[in-house]
Structures are given as structure tokens and as C-alpha cells.
């Protein structure tokens, strides 16, 4: 399988980047995008050239480390799949693949296709801590949570923090990410005391450092965890609830 690759090369955050063209003649349809980059890098190293820098870890779709733009789309052409699960079977012999970092004003490029996504970490940091009772662990049956609520919390906790939602959004909004966290945390038995304060701080952080949400829906289309667009509603719901409550909870 022959592919023409245009891969982003950028020495550092302040350096000017450019696409570097490479032709691959022996790509295999079962390869992932990351494995294709591994293959390219092996050839570069053998030739004494600098390999392309990109982020990856588990390659099982659960860590959120990998993240690339492929032909302008976060992760790749297949919906709701991370970069490590995007296979070359989606492409045809002779296709051109333009591979670059996730693009957002909130994600400065560190090198090549590695970006700094710590802006998402700062949203979570604003969530703070949760209060727990000291002493021995309580019996599980004393924490009342029905099955439907637990499933809803787990569905939203599935967010892997890859940041593709922000890169896909024309406004650069992080409302799907933040909404998923707020839904998950609001449903858990622990942390009720801090619910209001948590919502206020997280919403303030996301609206300060990311763009506004216009409900375009591109975020949900690329989310590897399949977080629904309805999660965005938690932003206004939790903010309104916090504004109407005189207490943190």
C-alpha cells in the first residue's frame, strides 16, 4: 500500500513549523496511524535523521495520551475512535495523509505533533478535593446509589481527556470535557459538600481559557469515549444550581 505523507515538523513552541513530505511504499492496511509513524521513524533513524515526535502510551484507547489531526480531523476519519485505533484500512492506495498536531489556541505545540494540553488539567484542578469521613471504610451498602445513576456516572467518567473535542470545535470550546466531568462528579455519593464551589470554579476556568460553546456538535463526533452532546447542558445546569445555592453544596 503506497501512501504520500505530509507530516508536521516543528522544533519548538516558538519555532516556525512546516509539513515534511515522505512517501511510504509498504504500508499495511491493518496498521494504525501511530504504527505508521513508528514505521516512518524507524526509516528515519536508520538513515541517521531525526524522527518525528508524537505522544502515545497505552495504545488501547484508554489513556488519552495520543492525539493527532489527520487530514484536518482530530484522531482520524473514523468516528469516536482515538488515534491509536484509527487504521489505514480507511484509506486507499495512493492517498495523501496530512498528519499534524491537535490544533487549538489552548494547546501550544511543544515539538512536532506533541502539544501541551495542561489547560484541561487546570480545569480539573479547579474541581478541588472531596470531603470524606475519617476512620474505617464504610460498608458499601451504606452508600446508596441506584444502578441507573451509577451507569450514567460511569458513562461520563469514561472521558479519557484526549482533548480532541477542543480541537474539533470551531470555537475551541472545552464544554464537552467539562460537562462530562461535572455530570460524573455530581452523581457520585462523595463530594456533595463541594458541588457548588466545584462547579463555579471549573466553569470559570473553562470560560476563561477556552472558547464559547455554540452546540455545533463536532466535539461529540470525535470523542473516543462517546460522551453525548447532552453533557454540555451540565455546564449551565450546575452553574445555575450553584448560583441559587448559598452553600457550596
Residue ranges and their predicted role:
Residues 31-50, 98-249:
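Ferredoxin-type iron-sulfur electron-transfer modules in oxidoreductases and energy-metabolism complexes
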Residues 8, 25, 70-72:
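Short strand-turn-strand beta-turns centered on an Asx-Gly dipeptide
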Residues 19-32:
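Short, contiguous acidic and Ser/Thr-rich linear segments
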Residues 7-13:
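Short polar catalytic/cofactor-binding loops
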Residues 70-94, 99:
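Glycine-rich phosphate/adenylate-binding loop and adjacent beta-alpha elements
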Residues 53-65:
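Short, structured protein-protein interaction patches enriched in aromatics and acidic/basic residues
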Residues 1-5:
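Short structural boundary motif marking the start of a folded domain
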Amino acid at each position: 500500500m503506497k501512501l504520500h505523507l505530509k507530516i508536521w515538523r516543528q522544533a519548538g513552541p516558538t519555532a516556525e513549523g512546516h509539513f515534511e513530505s515522505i512517501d511510504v511504499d509498504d504500508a499495511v492496511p491493518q496498521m494504525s496511524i501511530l504504527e505508521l509513524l513508528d514505521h516512518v521513524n524507524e526509516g528515519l533513524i536508520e538513515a541517521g535523521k531525526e524522527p518525528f515526535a508524537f505522544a502515545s502510551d497505552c495504545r488501547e484507547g484508554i489513556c488519552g495520551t495520543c492525539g493527532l489531526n489527520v487530514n484536518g480531523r482530530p484522531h482520524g476519519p473514523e468516528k469516536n475512535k482515538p488515534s491509536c485505533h484509527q487504521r489505514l484500512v480507511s484509506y486507499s492506495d495512493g492517498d495523501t495523509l496530512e498528519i499534524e498536531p491537535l490544533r487549538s489556541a489552548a494547546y501550544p505545540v511543544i515539538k512536532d505533533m506533541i502539544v501541551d494540553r495542561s489547560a484541561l488539567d487546570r480545569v480539573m484542578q479547579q474541581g478541588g478535593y472531596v470531603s470524606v469521613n475519617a476512620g474505617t471504610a464504610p460498608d458499601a451498602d451504606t452508600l446508596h446509589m441506584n444502578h441507573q445513576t451509577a451507569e450514567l456516572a460511569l458513562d461520563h467518567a469514561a472521558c479519557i481527556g484526549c482533548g480532541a473535542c477542543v480541537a474539533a470545535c470551531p470555537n475551541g470550546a472545552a464544554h464537552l470535557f467539562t460537562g462530562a466531568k461535572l455530570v460524573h462528579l455530581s452523581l457520585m455519593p462523595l463530594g456533595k459538600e463541594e458541588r457548588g464551589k466545584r462547579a463555579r470554579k471549573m466553569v470559570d476556568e473553562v470560560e476563561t481559557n477556552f472558547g464559547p460553546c455554540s452546540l455545533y456538535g463536532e466535539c461529540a463526533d470525535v470523542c473516543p469515549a462517546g460522551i453525548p452532546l447532552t453533557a454540555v447542558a451540565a455546564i449551565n445546569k450546575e452553574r445555575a444550581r450553584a448560583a441559587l445555592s448559598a452553600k457550596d453544596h
